[in-house]
Amino acid sequence: MGKFLATLILFFQFCPLILSDYSPSCCTLTIGVSSYHSKPCNPAQPVCSWTLDLLALSADQALQPPCPNLVSYSSYHATYSLYLFPHWIKKPNRNGGGYYSASYSDPCSLKCPYLGCQSWTCPYTGAVSSPYWKFQQDVNFTQEVSRLNINLHFSKCGFPFSLLVDAPGYDPIWFLNTEPSQLPPTAPPLLPHSNLDHILEPSIPWKSKLLTLVQLTLQSTNYTCIVCIDRASLSTWHVLYSPNVSVPSSSSTPLLYPSLALPAPHLTLPFNWTHCFDPQIQAIVSSPCHNSLILPPFSLSPVPTLGSRSRRAVPVAVWLVSALAMGAGMAGGITGSMSLASGRSLLHEVDKDISQLTQAIVKNHKNLLKIAQYAAQNRRGLDLLFWEQGGLCKALQEQCCFLNITNSHVSILQERPPLENRVLTGWGLNWDLGLSQWAREALQTGITLVALLLLVILAGPCILRQLRHLPSRVRYPHYSLINPESSL
């Protein structure tokens, strides 16, 4: 009898642990068309936590709002408190009357059209506490501006609730659903790139193998080509494999997916096969079948012939271009100097027009301020008339509009200096040097021409030489050691 009781006690102790492995491991919060998984939680670990952003929740709910014409959340509501309202499935009995309070239970459901919730339209406007929900035990939250942390007991996962910002006239609301679910499966970790070095390292060192391949390649081309090897990325390597050697059917791990794999049944190699290639998955695997050889891609280029060094003389085209540039610069300098004389008088006339426009804008701004004061008086009077209905905006069921008139732009417009002092007359960096306008323009044109001439003399011969040798470089063929179309 004692052994039976001991076995029964052990069974009831370990039974919750066994069943908890098959229970849902998280709580999923849904708003609009988006879902948020909580941290791992279950009956053994009942606290389900979320860290949410109110701006992101508003964007999610805007795709599928519970009510039309909801006022969205913005930084305007950063200073207002946030309230949480559970939605009841069963309506409890009402005891007593009066206004709703935290000790009274009544179903709080979202009704459309939603025109803004005040403190008396829902039974819970602060810490949630009722015979069904306890604020600290079942649900609690903390708010830091737009950042929201929610802790929900796992037993309450499956009930909807609402979040409300109690801002008069601006009451954004979020309607959230919760349901138990499983955490998404964790993706298997990828094989680190650093582990490929010792896995892909053959018995013969890479240095000896590559030197042997390069030596054989040079001998086959009679030392008339240059061998270029690229070992930058393992994914670009090539594979030669023998189809005569089969791959074991046991499960193996793919190590490398090469960019090119070619069968070589009758190829004579200077050394043995070092790796295992599976043709079905086109990858190097961890099985020790030794039917392949991996090598980095390398190419062949003919050795360029040595030519005589050409004489570095300035061609006639350089002098011709320099002369044309100097002539164009002088013509542009003269034309620009002549336009400065007429430009000064034009600036004076434009400055007069701007002054008259500024005076007209200032007068209109003063009239607008008077109209704004008149509208504000009427607004205050209408708010007093509709005081019992919550103000004019609540009575009209519209958003409140306000005027934002500032004097900063008008004052800046009046303080700006004359246009002639703000416009550069063509002389860069506003140098004066005590010279007249004509002398400054002539000096600037001369400096520009000298700089252009030096640039053409220094860079012109190099550019022409590169262009002259470009056709001969394009004609050089490019050979690849591994060609898919060649027969091995």
Swiss-Prot record:
Extracellular side: 21-442
Residues annotated as glycosylated: N140, N222, N244, N272, N404
Region feature Immunosuppression, mapped onto this chain: 376-392
Taxonomy, superkingdom: Viruses
Alphabetized InterPro entries for the sequence: TLV/ENV_coat_polyprotein
Pfam families referenced in this protein's UniProt entry, alphabetically: TLV_coat
Keywords tagged on the record: Cleavage on pair of basic residues, Coiled coil, Disulfide bond, Fusion of virus membrane with host cell membrane, Fusion of virus membrane with host membrane, Glycoprotein, Host cell membrane, Host membrane, Host-virus interaction, Lipoprotein, Membrane, Palmitate, Signal, Transmembrane, Transmembrane helix, Viral attachment to host cell, Viral envelope protein, Viral penetration into host cytoplasm, Virion, Virus entry into host cell
Ranges of the Cytoplasmic topological domain: 464-488
Example GO BP: virion attachment to host cell
Coiled coil regions, renumbered to chain: 341-387, 397-429
Site (Cleavage): R312, A313
Transmembrane residue ranges: 443-463
Region Fusion peptide: start-end pairs: 313-333
Disulfide bridge positions per record: C225-C228, C225-C401, C393-C400
Motif (CXXC): 225-228
Signal sequence, start to end: 1-20
Description of post-translational modifications: Specific enzymatic cleavages in vivo yield mature proteins. Envelope glycoproteins are synthesized as an inactive precursor that is N-glycosylated and processed likely by host cell furin or by a furin-like protease in the Golgi to yield the mature SU and TM proteins. The cleavage site between SU and TM requires the minimal sequence [KR]-X-[KR]-R. The CXXC motif is highly conserved across a broad range of retroviral envelope proteins. It is thought to participate in the formation of a labile disulfide bond possibly with the CX6CC motif present in the transmembrane protein. Isomerization of the intersubunit disulfide bond to an SU intrachain disulfide bond is thought to occur upon receptor recognition in order to allow membrane fusion.
GO cellular component: host cell plasma membrane; membrane; viral envelope; virion membrane
Short motif CX6CC, span: 393-401
PANTHER family recorded: ERVV2 PROTEIN (PTHR10424:SF81), VIRAL ENVELOPE PROTEIN (PTHR10424)
Purpose of the protein: The surface protein (SU) attaches the virus to the host cell by binding to its receptor. This interaction triggers the refolding of the transmembrane protein (TM) and is thought to activate its fusogenic potential by unmasking its fusion peptide. Fusion occurs at the host cell plasma membrane. The transmembrane protein (TM) acts as a class I viral fusion protein. Under the current model, the protein has at least 3 conformational states: pre-fusion native state, pre-hairpin intermediate state, and post-fusion hairpin state. During viral and target cell membrane fusion, the coiled coil regions (heptad repeats) assume a trimer-of-hairpins structure, positioning the fusion peptide in close proximity to the C-terminal region of the ectodomain. The formation of this structure appears to drive apposition and subsequent fusion of viral and target cell membranes.
Subunit structure: The mature envelope protein (Env) consists of a trimer of SU-TM heterodimers attached by a labile interchain disulfide bond.
Domain notes: The 17 amino acids long immunosuppressive region is present in many retroviral envelope proteins. Synthetic peptides derived from this relatively conserved sequence inhibit immune function in vitro and in vivo.
Additional facts recorded: HTLV-1 lineages are divided in four clades, A (Cosmopolitan), B (Central African group), C (Melanesian group) and D (New Central African group).
Descriptive protein name: Envelope glycoprotein gp62
Gene of this entry: env
